[in-house]
Design a protein with these regions (language model features):
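Amphipathic, small/basic residue-rich leader segments at the start of a protein or domain
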Residues: 1-77, 88-90, 98, 102, ...
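A short, Trp-centered hydrophobic/proline-enriched beta-strand micro-motif
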Residues: 106-114, 163
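Glycine-rich phosphate/pyrophosphate-binding beta-alpha loops
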Residues: 119, 149-154, 196-197, 383-388
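Alpha-helix capping/hinge segments and adjacent helical runs
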Residues: 20, 328, 332-422
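C-terminal helix-coil-helix/basic helical segment that borders enzyme active sites and/or dimer interfaces
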Residues: 267, 281-308, 313-366
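A structural signal for short hydrophobic beta-strand segments in well-ordered beta-sheet cores
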Residues: 128-132
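Glycine-rich beta->alpha junctions and the first turn(s) of the following alpha-helix
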Residues: 188-285, 300-304, 308, 313-319, ...
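A short core secondary-structure module
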Residues: 140-141, 145-191
Length: 422
């Protein structure tokens, strides 16, 4: 049984064998992965030790201050937060061995090819087609044609998680399959989408005759929607449930500005800041509780053969160790707080808060809410209630799958995708 003392010993051995001051960055990250200290809740041989997720903090604390490099999580967040848990749950052993190590070390960046111009909030209506070469029974490669949009990191990515329609003759949720797509395929074209900040974090991706071997399919043919739910639930936890210290993140910046500028204070702004501070702390503690629900290990699904399979559910009905719909609530809280805090900050700083004059076209590796000016935060936060699931859709998920309220009526449940009006 791996405990905190065992992890401290293993970390000390890693540092002794690979001193950060004299070890190449990539060599150190690979050694850390091989030692099971990358994500301790993953299985042995895949960067982990089958330990409780909560013990990752022990490893992080032991490495802090040693000069040990990190894997640049802001740059590879889609791989860490979405692709990795999906591959772990639904991938073959060969897929896990091939993809997880370079994903974690940052050698290979991942992106997500889900949303389409006509399938955003109604993602299951997607139209990108994947057709089996030689027919459904031939066992050949898949040829993919279509368009995806709002794709973060597509301009950096080596791989993409992709959902595409493989059967248009069944209802929309049942005709989808899930693939790993090679972003270097000559049929992949990435175009930047410029945002309100002037940057282009996002992209639109055109797929023309892209060839995907069947060995790069995750899950069974036609069960891609089930696989995608794991990705989406993990995405919302990754966005809304990131660990922050008390008074960290955007609320910390707002509080620091308040302390630094007494001449700008008013009673109304003070009361609003206090309310936002309390709400941010409630959200932080709720995130801690969610992580405790996930803390046993990710090995809680029948796919992984864990003794915990079928164990006690989280609040939203998912097994312990797997995110459930309650993660949607965390993402909702994050989006609302980011917008309200950034709005408060702009109002507090008056004309200085509106200063944002760098409209240079850039392709950043990620979002930097804490290292930029207030005007940037205000503009960028507007997208938080859209990306990763719109707040309106997430409210429906919380209502139906957490609170148990009646679902919205659906008229297309048994209608083949090809017969849906478009």
């Amino acid at each position: 049984m791996t405990d905190a003392d065992d992890l401290r010993r293993r970390t000390a051995e890693l540092l002794a064998a690979h001193p950060p001051a004299t070890t190449d960055r990539l060599e150190f990250l690979r050694a850390r992965f091989d030692a099971g200290l990358a994500w301790v809740h993953f299985p042995q041989g895949l960067g982990g030790l089958d330990a409780p997720r909560s013990l990752q903090a022990v490893v992080d604390a032991e490495l802090e201050g040693t000069g040990a490099p990190d894997n640049d999580p802001g740059r590879i967040g889609i791989g860490l937060g979405m692709a990795a848990p999906t591959i772990l749950r639904f991938g073959t052993e060969e897929q896990k061995q091939r993809f997880l190590r370079p994903l974690w070390t940052g050698e290979e960046v991942w992106c997500q090819l889900f949303s389409e111009p006509g399938a955003g909030s109604d993602l299951a209506a997607l139209a990108t087609r994947a057709v089996r070469e030689g027919g459904a029974e031939a066992g050949g490669d898949w040829i993919v044609d279509g368009q995806k949009v709002w794709t973060s990191s597509a301009h950096l990515a080596r791989w993409a998680i992709l959902i595409a329609r493989t059967d248009p003759d069944v209802p929309k949720h049942r005709g989808i399959s899930y693939f790993v797509c090679d972003m270097t395929d000559p049929g992949v074209e990435v175009r930047p989408l410029r945002q309100i900040t002037g940057e282009a974090e996002f992209n639109e991706v055109f797929l023309t005759g892209v060839r995907i071997p069947d060995a790069h399919r995750l899950g069974a043919v036609g069960e891609g929607w089930k696989v995608a739910q794991t990705t989406l639930m993990n995405e919302r936890v990754a966005i809304g449930g990131a660990r922050t210290p008390r008074e960290g993140g955007m609320i910390g910046i707002a509080a620091a500005g308040w302390r630094a500028h007494p001449e700008l204070r008013t009673h109304d702004l003070h009361q609003r800041l206090l309310n936002l501070w309390v709400e941010a702390e409630v959200a932080r503690l709720t995130g801690e509780r969610l992580r405790q629900q996930l803390s046993p290990t990710l090995n809680s699904s029948p796919t992984l053969g864990s003794a915990r399979a079928g164990g006690p559910p989280c609040a939203g009905g998912a097994p312990m160790g797997q995110p459930g719909p309650e993660g949607s609530g965390m993402k909702l809280a994050f989006a609302r707080l980011a917008q309200e805090i950034s709005g408060w900050e702009v109002e507090f700083l008056a004309e200085d808060g509106l200063t944002y004059d760098d409209w240079t076209m850039r392709r950043p590796d990620g979002v930097d809410f804490t290292g930029r000016e207030a005007g940037y935060r205000y503009l960028r936060a507007k997208g938080n209630s859209i990306e990763g699931g719109t707040s309106e859709v997430l409210l429906n998920i919380v209502a139906e799958r957490v609170l148990g309220l009646p679902p919205e009526p659906r008229t297309d449940k048994d209608v083949a995708w090809k017969d849906l009006p478009r």
